[in-house]
Amino acid sequence: AAILRPQLRRLGAQCEAWNSRYQTVEAGLQETPGLSLVPRPAAEKYVGSSIQFLLLDWPPEAVQDVLGRCADRGVELKWFGGAEPSGFTSRYDSWRYAESAPMPKSDRILAGLIDMRIPLTFSLEDCALIARIIRAEVSAVYQAA
């Protein structure tokens, strides 16, 4: 409890800082060909500690190409469409403790779903640069297809 109290006092400011970073990345990714962002309802309250975007109906090889190109430039993205879970990207079909029925509509979305954590150690300038890198690499792979 003693460790948590000071953090609780700063929680509002921390949430605002995350959202500023999220909004910077989001603005930089807007209108990227081949990339979809999930529109957020105006009334929604959220904490943008990560951002998700969609490369809908992309071949797995093209998604992997984007991930590799971004990684080569220092931007680590996580993909929910990989055959095996990586980090926090597990899907329902990789859960070993419960059987599942096929969910083709979910599979289609997960096959193109990309996630990136946004730590508070990133400055707004870092976030703008990261968005430019993602935009450039997605655009390059999309145009080559």
Which positions does each model-derived feature cover?
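Generic structural signal for small/hydrophobic residues in well-ordered secondary structure
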Residues: W18, I51, C70-A71, I109, ...
